[in-house]
């Protein structure tokens, strides 16, 4: 995605840029920052975090609220943790569909100040022409969980033990293949 040299001339292009600036919480006109925030999240990190945060899809939050990334909220739709301390008021964000959970996760990593180091390291890898992999970035996610460095060690372990790095170069295509079944 190269935005810096492009002149946006059509109304549709301008509308798209305005929408992305809002979505990624970027100051008006800062296309360089938009490019940094719109970059990929390595597949292995997303899979490892979803597995860890949702108990491999078996947690109450995943089953009742499509919450596979364990994102906290204090004012949104959510599910209260059963073992939450009495002086705490957070909930786990709840979603109507899994796709909404994934989009919120993407927006969280790409916009929240707690993940600035994640975005900076990812951008450094991009600028050096290096592969952007989960194992290269997990150390930047210490703020994702209260356990800090221990959390990043667990993510690395999940990625390695389950060979999630094998999925780094996978590309999903938006197509339908018709298959005939023999009766």
Where are these regions (language model features)?
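Catalytic cores of secreted/periplasmic lytic hydrolases that degrade extracellular macromolecules
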Residues: 1-48, 52-183
């Amino acid at each position: 995605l190269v935005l810096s040299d492009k002149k946006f001339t059509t109304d549709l292009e301008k509308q798209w840029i305005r929408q992305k600036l809002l979505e990624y919480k970027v100051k008006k006109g800062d296309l360089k920052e938009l490019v940094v925030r719109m970059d990929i999240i390595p597949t292995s990190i997303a899979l490892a975090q979803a597995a860890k945060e949702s108990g491999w899809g078996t947690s109450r939050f995943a089953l009742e609220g499509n919450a596979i990334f364990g994102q906290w909220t204090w004012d949104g739709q959510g599910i209260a943790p059963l073992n939450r301390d009495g002086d705490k008021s957070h909930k786990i964000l709840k979603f109507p569909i899994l796709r909404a959970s994934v989009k919120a996760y993407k927006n969280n990593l790409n916009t929240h100040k707690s993940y600035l180091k994640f975005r900076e390291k990812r951008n450094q890898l991009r600028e050096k022409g290096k592969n952007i992999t989960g194992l290269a970035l997990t150390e930047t996610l210490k703020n994702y969980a209260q356990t800090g460095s221990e959390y990043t060690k667990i993510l690395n372990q999940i990625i390695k033990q389950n060979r999630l790095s094998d999925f780094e170069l996978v590309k999903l295509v938006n197509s339908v293949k018709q298959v005939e079944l023999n009766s």
